[in-house]
From Swiss-Prot:
The keyword RNA-binding applies. The active site is at C105, C201. Its main location: cytoplasm. Residues 151-153, 307-308 are annotated as: Interaction with tRNA. The keyword RNA-binding applies. This is tRNA-specific 2-thiouridylase MnmA. Pfam families: tRNA_Me_trans (PF03054), tRNA_Me_trans_C (PF20258), tRNA_Me_trans_M (PF20259). It comes from Leptospira interrogans serogroup Icterohaemorrhagiae serovar copenhageni (strain Fiocruz L1-130).
Length: 375
């Protein structure tokens, strides 16, 4: 007996292909869709084949559909992708932030817009090839870590709503990547041994600077400064830098220097290794999953992850009128505005909530006058 219809987002890779195959074996009527998010004549898709927006990947996804004998469609998502992902990506760099476009894509495109398309077709369920699981905490649903530590993608999925979480299936959450490839070979899927993309889909060769230049973004030049206000160099654009960066600064100093803050006036603040740790930071644009929304003034001890592959550390969070204040209870460095922070219970692996890192705790002392050491 059929379990009903389900839409599977198919990128052309092995993970989504196996997802479709497993759901078929489980009794679902699978409909495969590929999300067209980018204009294929654009350089971002002409210069690389390892991109989920490339024509090659659409053909691979279609070949999987033929192999599995399921319906397959390409859905146009260029407009929402431009507005919610690319425009925000550019805007964040223009404001001295380091964006995380994969989070925005999952929240607004792969799950937000795709769920709307599914509903319009009378289909409630969708599935993807993410390495994540669904957990319950009382009446609330939450993303939980996939068991493959090296592939776990929970960090990128904190933006899913309760309605999304009730109706999404992640068949790969209990599997490892080698197991997925083995299943693909058993199923005879044409992408069983296809290599993975490690790039942002619209950024060829991961060169975001070149992408910004092609979008005619004006870079903001300024000075390299120390925390005490001393000027130690010039740069051609704050957009070239991110928090924690050490290489490519071009500054000769007695000890290695790191980017610890990027200012609105174009100044890039540098510090030595012991100056890279954060005392507190704020998180905005919150989405609560396993935890019911906090009231202003409420506090909670939990764990925070401040970037992908960062091991969560203990912290105390306090709900403010706008977002949270986070006080780490263990050392953390390189907290970066524009990146996401996700929060876990102290003793479990499901997401309580997540949001965007707004502003670090670094306070810069301005020397009067600033002492220049430029040649």
């Amino acid at each position: 007996m059929s379990k009903g219809k389900i839409i599977v987002a198919m990128s052309g890779g092995v993970d989504s292909a196996v997802t479709a195959g497993l759901l078929m074996e489980d009794g679902y009527e699978v409909i495969g869709v590929n999300l067209r998010t980018w204009e294929y004549e654009a350089p971002a898709c002409d210069t690389t084949k390892k991109s989920c927006c490339s024509p090659e990947d659409i053909r691979d996804a279609r070949d999987v559909g033929i192999s599995l004998k399921i319906p397959f469609y390409v859905i146009k998502m260029e407009k929402v992708f431009q507005e919610k992902v690319i425009d925000r990506f550019i805007e964040d760099y223009q404001h001295g932030k380091t964006p995380n476009p994969c989070v925005e894509c999952n929240t607004f495109v792969k799950f937000g817009a795709l769920f709307e398309k599914a509903k319009a077709l009378g289909i409630d369920k969708i599935a993807t090839g993410h390495y994540a699981r669904i957990a319950r905490n009382g009446e609330r649903y939450a993303i939980a870590n996939g068991i493959d530590v090296g592939k776990n993608q929970a960090y990128y999925l904190y933006g899913l709503s309760q309605e999304n979480l009730k109706n999404v299936i992640f068949p790969l959450g209990e599997m490892t990547k080698p197991e997925v490839r083995q299943i693909a070979r058993r199923m005879g899927l044409p992408v069983a041994d296809k290599s993975e993309s490690q790039e942002i889909c619209f950024i060829p060769e991961n060169d975001y600077r070149k992408f910004l230049e092609k979008k005619n973004v004006e870079f903001t030049p300024g000075f390299f400064k120390l925390k005490d206000g001393r000027i130690v160099g010039k740069h051609k654009g704050r957009e070239n830098f991110t928090i924690g960066q050490r290489k490519g600064l071009g500054i000769a100093w007695k000890n290695p220097l790191y980017v610890i803050s990027i200012e609105d006036d174009g100044s890039v603040i540098l510090g030595e290794e012991n100056e890279t740790y954060n005392e507190s930071f704020s998180v905005i644009d919150l989405n609560f999953q396993g935890l019911a929304p906090l009231n202003e003034g409420e506090s909670l001890e939990c764990r925070v992850q401040v970037r992908y592959r960062h091991i969560p550390i203990r912290c105390k969070i306090t709900k403010m009128k706008e977002g949270l204040i986070v006080h780490p209870l263990e050392d953390v460095r390189g907290v970066t505005p524009g990146q996401s922070a996700v929060f876990y219970p102290l003793d479990s692996d499901y997401l309580l909530l997540g949001g965007i890192i707004s502003k670090g705790s670094i306070q810069m002392r301005v020397a009067e006058p600033a002492i220049s050491v430029l040649n």
